C-alpha cells in the first residue's frame, strides 16, 4: 500500500473545515487534527484570549510554528485556521507537504454560519461583522486559491456529500483506487 499523503483543508471561518475534516479523516482512516485546537491545547487558553493578550501577530507566530510541526506528520487530515494562509511560510509548508483543499464559501453563508459563534476573535468586537468577512475574503481568498490543489464550494452541500466528492477527486488525482 502506498504511503498516505496528508490532506490540508484551508478556507475561511465557517467554510466547514472542521466538520468536513473529521468525517474525511474517519472515512479515510486517517488522523484528524485542527491546528487551532492544538494551539489551544498547548497554551491552555482559547484563541480569543491569545488574540487579546498577544494580538494577531503573536497568535500568527504561534500558528506558524504549529503548522510547520503538524505538516511534517504523516497520514493526517489537517484543518487550518482561516488566517493560516497569511503566512508565506505556512503556504509553503502546506503546498509542499500534502494535498491542499480549499473549502470555498460565500460571505453570506459564512455570516450565517458564524454569527452566533462567540469564539471568532476577528468578529467578536466588530460593529459590522459582515464587512469584516468581506474584507478578510478580499485578502485571503486569493491566497487560498494560490495553494489549492482542489477547490470545492461548500455553500449548498452537506458534509457527507462533500467528503465523498473529496475522496473521489483525490482518487482521480492519484489514480490509486482509494489509496492516498
From Swiss-Prot:
It is found in: Cytoplasm. ATP binds at residues 14-19, 120, 157. It comes from Haemophilus influenzae (strain PittEE). It holds the Pfam family SKI. It is an enzyme of class 2 (transferase). Keywords: Amino-acid biosynthesis, Aromatic amino acid biosynthesis, ATP-binding, Cytoplasm, Kinase, Magnesium, Metal-binding, Nucleotide-binding, Transferase. Monomer. GO terms for cellular component: cytosol. It comes from the Bacteria. Belongs to the shikimate kinase family. This is Shikimate kinase. Substrate binds at residues 36, 60, 82, 140. Its cofactor is Mg(2+). One of its GO terms (molecular function) is ATP binding. It catalyses: shikimate + ATP = 3-phosphoshikimate + ADP + H(+). InterPro entries: P-loop_NTPase, Shikimate/glucono_kinase, Shikimate_kinase/TSH1, Shikimate_kinase_CS. Binds 1 Mg(2+) ion per subunit. Its main location: cytoplasm. Catalyzes the specific phosphorylation of the 3-hydroxyl group of shikimic acid using ATP as a cosubstrate. GO terms for biological process: amino acid biosynthetic process; aromatic amino acid family biosynthetic process; chorismate biosynthetic process. Mg(2+) binds at residue 18. The keyword Hydrolase does not apply. Pathway: Metabolic intermediate biosynthesis; chorismate biosynthesis; chorismate from D-erythrose 4-phosphate and phosphoenolpyruvate: step 5/7.
Amino acid at each position: 500500500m502506498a504511503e498516505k499523503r496528508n490532506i490540508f483543508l484551508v478556507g475561511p471561518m465557517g467554510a466547514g473545515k472542521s466538520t468536513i475534516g473529521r468525517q474525511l479523516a474517519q472515512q479515510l482512516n486517517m488522523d484528524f487534527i485542527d491546528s487551532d485546537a492544538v494551539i489551544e491545547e498547548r497554551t491552555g487558553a482559547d484563541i480569543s484570549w491569545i488574540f487579546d493578550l498577544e494580538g494577531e501577530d503573536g497568535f500568527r507566530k504561534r500558528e506558524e510554528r504549529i503548522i510547520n510541526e503538524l505538516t511534517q506528520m504523516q497520514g493526517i487530515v489537517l484543518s487550518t485556521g482561516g488566517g493560516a494562509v497569511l503566512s508565506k511560510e505556512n503556504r509553503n509548508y502546506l503546498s509542499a507537504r500534502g494535498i491542499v483543499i480549499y473549502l470555498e464559501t460565500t460571505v453570506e453563508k459564512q455570516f450565517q454560519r458564524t454569527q452566533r459563534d462567540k469564539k471568532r476573535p476577528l468578529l467578536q468586537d466588530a460593529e459590522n461583522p459582515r464587512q469584516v468577512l468581506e474584507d478578510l475574503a478580499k485578502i485571503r481568498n486569493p491566497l487560498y486559491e494560490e495553494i489549492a490543489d482542489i477547490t470545492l464550494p461548500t455553500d449548498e452541500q452537506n458534509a457527507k456529500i462533500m467528503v465523498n466528492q473529496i475522496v473521489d477527486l483525490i482518487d482521480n488525482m492519484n489514480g490509486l483506487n482509494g489509496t492516498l
